[in-house]
Amino acid sequence: MNDTMAIWFAQIVGREVHLVDYLEGEGEGIEFYADELNKKGYRYGGHFGPHDLAVRELGTGLSRSDVAKQFGIKFETIPRISNHAEGIQAVRQFLPVCWIDEEACAQGVNCIDNFRKEWDDKRGVYKDRPRHDWASHGAKALETLARADLFARLSRQDFAKSRPPSRRGNWAAHT
């Protein structure tokens, strides 16, 4: 079983998504990542994870989402996609609104740069699915973030509650 965890840290700034940090590791439980999130000192507006957070562990009967709740992380599960092309297209539409801290996100950017389709040696063509290797974890984590529809979530009450009140009132940008 592969237990690699990849986390992108995003900040909404106007009509942009700033990818400000990236964390990846393996061989650690959710409690480790909860501790790492707390150490970062960020104020989180939400946590978004893939559909497999609902998988229940045989030993405890708890899902990964249940375990995360015990450490103060409430995930919104992003539904499974019907095909890989849908996820790739979501990232293609998402990236133009992103600004990436190249230093803090270097490992994640490397994953995106190296995410590839899998080659079928027998048939001499690419398969219709991506290659599952070290780069796929960061790329799939970005896909999950891209499909989280962050801008729509800004207007939701529970997401807005986590943001400090503005002292400037209502400002708008005109283009």
Predicted regions and their residues:
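Short acidic, Gly/Ser-rich segments with clustered Asp/Glu that frequently serve as metal-coordination loops
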Residues: 1-4
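Mg2+-dependent endonuclease catalytic cores in nucleic-acid-processing enzymes, primarily RNase H-like
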Residues: 8-133, 152-153, 164-175
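Acidic, Mg2+-coordinating catalytic module of metal-dependent nucleases/exonucleases
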Residues: 132-154
